[in-house]
């Protein structure tokens, strides 16, 4: 089975992404996290094929860790089995994408607000 980790602190965004993926990729297994800490706990217990990461996480939900989606991307890349795993960043801050592309070698990114069509198109491109 194809397994996806969605790191998104906005619950409405998280639900929307999950709904889109469930409708278009109904055999995928989806896990969601709202914080860096939750995402770290999941990555330690599950195996993932794809990561969808919000760059800017609400610091009120970070559990005393001053970390964001870019930090989680660095953590992913530090794990040998995820060296080349696809990462798609979701952001309202396109100026931070350069780091994700250059340093973390993310597969793609989407600038918020994006459409369901654009999300599906991006994922289809990665996995065609």
Question: Each predicted region: which residue ranges?
Answer:
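As written
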Residues: 102-110
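Acidic, metal-coordinating helix/loop segments flanking the phosphotransfer/catalytic sites
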Residues: 18, 32-50, 58
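Acidic di-acidic motifs
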Residues: 8-9, 92
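Short amphipathic alpha-helix used as the core "switch/output" element in two-component signaling
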Residues: 62-83
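Non-catalytic signal-transmission and effector/linker regions of two-component phosphorelay proteins
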Residues: 1-5, 11-18, 127-128
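Two-component/phosphorelay signaling modules centered on CheY-like receiver
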Residues: 10-37
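Hydrophobic/aromatic residues positioned on beta-strands within the core alpha/beta folds
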Residues: 88-90
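C-terminal output helix
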Residues: 114-123
């Amino acid at each position: 089975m194809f397994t996806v980790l969605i790191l998104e602190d906005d619950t409405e965004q998280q639900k929307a992404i999950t709904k889109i993926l469930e409708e278009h990729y109904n055999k995928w297994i989806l896990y969601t996290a709202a914080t860096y800490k939750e995402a770290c706990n999941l990555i330690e217990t599950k195996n993932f094929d794809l990561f969808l990461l919000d760059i800017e996480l609400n610091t009120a939900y970070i559990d005393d860790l001053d970390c964001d989606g870019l930090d989680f991307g660095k953590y992913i890349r530090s794990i040998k089995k995820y060296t080349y795993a696809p990462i798609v960043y979701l952001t309202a801050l396109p100026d931070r994408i350069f780091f994700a592309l250059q340093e973390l070698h993310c597969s793609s990114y989407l600038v918020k607000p994006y459409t369901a069509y654009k999300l599906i198109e991006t994922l289809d491109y990665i996995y065609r």
